[in-house]
UniProtKB/Swiss-Prot annotation:
Top-level taxonomy: Eukaryota, Metazoa, Chordata, Craniata, Vertebrata
Chain's gene name: Ano8
Name of the protein described by the UniProt record: Anoctamin-8
Biased composition, class Basic and acidic residues, residue ranges: 14-23, 680-694, 899-927, 935-950, 1049-1060
Topological domains, Extracellular: 266-281, 378-400, 459-745, 824-836
The organism of origin for this protein: Mus musculus (Mouse)
Acidic residues: bias regions: 549-559, 581-602
Topology feature Cytoplasmic, residues: 2-244, 303-356, 422-437, 767-802, 858-1060
Amino acid sequence: MAEAASGAGDVTLEGERGKRPPPEGEPAAPASGVLDKLFGKRLLQAGRYLVSHKAWMKTVPTEDCDVLMTFPDTTDDHTLLWLLNHIRVGIPELIVQVRHHRHTRAYAFFVTATYESLLRGADELGLRKAVKAEFGGGTRSFSCEEDFIYENVESELRFFTSQERQSIIRFWLQNLRAKQGEALHNVRFLEDQPIIPELAARGIIQQVFPVHEQRILNRLMKSWVQAVCENQPLDDICDYFGVKIAMYFAWLGFYTSAMVYPAVFGSVLYTFTEADQTSRDVSCVVFALFNVIWSTLFLEEWKRRGAELAYKWGTLDSPGEAVEEPRPQFRGIRRISPITRAEEFYYPPWKRLLFQLLVSLPLCLACLICVFILMLGCFQLQELVLSVKGLPRLVRFLPKVMLALLVSVSAEGYKKLAVWLNDMENYRLESTYERHLIIKVVLFQFVNSYLSLFYIGFYLKDMDRLKEMLATLLITRQLLQNVREVLQPHLYRRLGSGELGLRTILELARALLGLLNPLRPDPRRHLEAQADEGGAGSRRCLGGGCGAPEEENEEEEEAAVERRPAGEGGEVPEGPRGGKEEDEEEDDDEDEDEEYEGEEGSLLDCGLRLKKVSFAERGAGRRRPGPSPDGLLEEGSPTMVEKGLEPGVFTLAEEDDEPEGPPGSPGPEPQTVLLRRARGEGRDQGPDGDRDTETGSGDAAGRQKRHNRSSWIDPPEEEHSPQLTQAELESCMKKYEDTFQDYQEMFVQFGYVVLFSSAFPLAALCALVNNLIEIRSDAFKLCTGLQRPFGRRVESIGQWQKVMEAMGVLAIVVNCYLIGQCGQLQRLFPWLSPEAAIVSVVVLEHLALLVKYLIHVAIPDIPGWVAEEMAKLEYQRREAFKRHERQAQQRFQQQQRRRREEEERQRHAEQQARRERDTGGREEARAEAPGPDPVAERGAAKAKGSERPRRPGALLPPGPVLRLKQIIPLQTRPPAPTGCAPPPRSPADTRLPAFLSLRFLKAPERGPSPPRPGKLFAFSAREPSANGAPGGGARAHRSAGDEPAAAEPEPRPEDAGHRP
């Protein structure tokens, strides 16, 4: 029997990927635990101990993973390989690992990136980072060219937060685009269409979400969730969850702080003005005017506070996106865009308008009619109850409570209807989609929440009844809201499917009352007594109804396995529990955990025992990893390279957790296990290598079932550790939708406070208490029960600010009408006629609107210091830009100068090389030719010299050559006596014209020299110059170009006849 059970266990293990959950139509297995009925098995076997946040401490942390991408368990290998190849080719900056989740039987991509790649991604994303003080301070978009100006850029751990890393990776994944004509199965992509959003919209990718960072999460649990009486760590929230979520909690905290004033003032009025009717009328009027002023001040002050936070987080002056991508859910006909000339989806606007007129509008009107009918039915029931004499006061409130319950339930239905209508209207952009969804939901909620109050106040004109109805709606809605957020959304799913009946609700109430009782008995003893009375073979715990057997049953099963005959192997099979010693140690550890954690720890231990049960039958089939002869896991494997995967894509985890067998058992297997044995083909072999015939049939069936679904992409089967990985646990959590639902709840509450609080002054106090709980419950929900959302950068709370401002204007009209029509004004001023009362109400309304407008104008939206800092930062940016432009221009000029110098140097080098080649060629030709004749060379040189054009100075005879400035005065001088040499002149005299020379003006007159026939100027053949050199001062001042002519040899007398 033991062998058969072991074989069956192997078959179940190998076929676990082929398992599917039972259809929803089939009845689920009965469970005795209340929490199991509420939450079910949706969160896998380990989902039952998610109630406690200490479940995080029991999971194996996931390292080297920022973003997790999971796929359904039915995804084929071709899809995984196609997407993996596109990611690695299209986004080489990412590091992708493929892993298989054992419990969910699904594949997942573990995505991360290096620090250098993240820096480039921050530059592409335009991520705003803090700038050092010496470079102007403030924040600006990151640039890799100027990375030195940013704070902490040298530190890899301090520069990027985990939320920023995940945002960069998400930006890359969303910008992975398809080429023209690409397709995956029946999904055909447009050119440049994002691949991953489209696959996620089609259901091929199950989810893409960032992974929690447990160290920071634990710190937030202590400083945020558990610190009830302290301020919220908004900066830490912004760094971890992003600006949008941090802005919501900042608004909620500011709203709660502002709610203190109307709560205190309303409580004082309610306490001291209930003596007589006149006091109540006065308090009603005063509190209505107070609420109008308070709501205006609150909204204006929040604008200033939001601007401060946006400036601090670097989103106040951030530029908007120039081009917004279409929604992945947008569908239409294919056409060529008239703007980009690329293929795109197009949905005609007339179809959307037709759907709005024929479907959306009629459904909205039908919903409003249904709300009105339900309201009238509850009011008729209320009248019937009030007509019966002698009923308790609590029974009189039952119709009001029923109406409040109907309003709360209808709100959920209306929200789903609004989402469906918005989807069917098929908006192209996400911003347009969100704006229309807000309009629909706000209109639905406004009518559904306030219709009964308007009916009582405007039609029945009964302030007492209005006060009771407002109190009932407000308190009931807040209680249901808190219960829903604490007990998880699965309660509603079970309620809708009929699995949550009256008996289960009573058991839940009894269990909650037992938890609140400090003197409650130990639930284990109660369950043991029930198990003994019923004779059940396995015990179930109250904490989760998980069906995990107790330790005694586990020990009995293991003892049965240990009593296996020696001929069947003779050794105790390896498994999670190798012997009784380990069982005792584990029991001692569990007892310590129970003593330390109390009831919460018992629930956690139940989940751990459940995991041990799920792996209890896998002990006989465990094997140690070893190298494969086929090279599947070897580095540089041809199989891996051929298929496009990296050798290290699969990670073997928990290899060192293999427990050793008892003394006498064989040691660890050698590391030469064949691939077939690593895949389970050698499991039915004994320690000596012989095949175990008893277990061969079961293992053969398991191998056959596994072979049918086996895939080469399957990673090697890891050690069967009972611990659950963090990534697998988070993939089972519910996704955090958005802040939309939270803002919607606060919008309804704000309307209750400002619209009708004059009838019930304690409404603000009830809202204050609810908000104090709401902050911590939302924080607890984000930190423990939901997946981590991607961070989004926003400037403010968006459209909700405008919606609440419109609510403030409407509050003035409603309160003034209630004052005029419900009798307060007539009772305070009985001498007023009806016409005068109406005029007084209109005047009061206009005065209130004027006061609201003056407050709006008087208080600027942006604080003065923020405006100054922004102006200073803008000035510094401009100056830095100018400085950058000058530096860039100087660098450009230097580059141009260096380029010209390099070109000039290259040109000179080429000329020099050419000159050397020519000189070398002439020398070679001269060396090859016979000896030259000196007379012939001299004649050739003369002929060449005569042919060469000469400058005018070279045509004159050698001797003292004067320039024009020396010639002009000589023409008017008398001829000098023969044989007298002219006085020497200094070089400075020859640089100035003669008529400007001081020496010339003071020199004595000289006689003209006798002219010589045939000569224009009286130049002697060889007249010594002033400096003793032939040629005079003119030749001394010749340019470099005249030097060759001056160096020419003196012609001989016999050649004088050849001169021109």
